Amino acid sequence: MFRLDLLSDPLEQFKLWYDEAIRHETLHPDAMVLATADSKGKPSARNVLYKGISKGGFLIFTNYHSRKAHELDENPQAAWVFYWPKTYKQVRGEGRVERLTQEESEAYFETRSYESQIAAWVSEQSQEIPDREYLITRYKKYREKFQDDVRCPEFWGGFRLIPDRMEFWVGQEHRLHDRFCYLKENQEWKIIRLAP
């Protein structure tokens, strides 16, 4: 891969690679590892689902009572990684994080399937529960409560991950991989090549 192969905007470059991963029938191309840290710097990571790009950032949605949400509120910086084995490509991002507005979260919530909307009410994410039956009971309760329209819970919504650094990696023979890094400087993106 050559520098001239890259677009000047890393978000647009990401979209190209993401679409390529979809065309190659990658299993869960929208899965990304999100790394956060609490106010003391203790890190944690987990897979989340990427839900699009808006206003210069990657969108994710979660329960605001979850560990990730607490950490993003305490320390609004994050790192994230997409890896697509079928195309042998990886994209890394780092940057600041902001909560979406209630209106943005509700607009996305309305696009979710009925079952996913119910699940948002059911899961007390990251909290200890007694057993699986507890979840099933809650699921039945909320299906009964919301038989038609499911409103967006106040404790559920999105975050925008706004990168100031992004890295695009392509695996090559003999471990001579291609790595290009986009760095945001004075509101402009600078692109440099990194050693593998």
Swiss-Prot record:
InterPro entries: Pyridox_Oxase, Pyridox_Oxase_CS, Pyridox_Oxase_N, Pyridoxamine_oxidase_dimer_C, Split_barrel_FMN-bd. The keyword Oxidoreductase applies. Belongs to the pyridoxamine 5'-phosphate oxidase family. GO terms for molecular function: FMN binding; pyridoxamine phosphate oxidase activity. FMN binds at residues 46-51, 61-62, 67-68, 90, 125-126, 169, 179. Substrate binds at residues 51, 108, 112, 116, 175-177. Its cofactor is FMN. It is an enzyme of class 1 (oxidoreductase). Catalyzes the oxidation of either pyridoxine 5'-phosphate (PNP) or pyridoxamine 5'-phosphate (PMP) into pyridoxal 5'-phosphate (PLP). The keyword Transmembrane does not apply. It catalyses: pyridoxamine 5'-phosphate + O2 + H2O = pyridoxal 5'-phosphate + H2O2 + NH4(+); pyridoxine 5'-phosphate + O2 = pyridoxal 5'-phosphate + H2O2. One of its GO terms (biological process) is pyridoxal phosphate biosynthetic process. Keywords: Flavoprotein, FMN, Oxidoreductase, Pyridoxine biosynthesis. Pfam families: PNP_phzG_C, PNPOx_N. Pathway: Cofactor metabolism; pyridoxal 5'-phosphate salvage; pyridoxal 5'-phosphate from pyridoxamine 5'-phosphate: step 1/1; Cofactor metabolism; pyridoxal 5'-phosphate salvage; pyridoxal 5'-phosphate from pyridoxine 5'-phosphate: step 1/1. Binds 1 FMN per subunit. The gene is pdxH. This is Pyridoxine/pyridoxamine 5'-phosphate oxidase. Its EC number is 1.4.3.5. Homodimer.
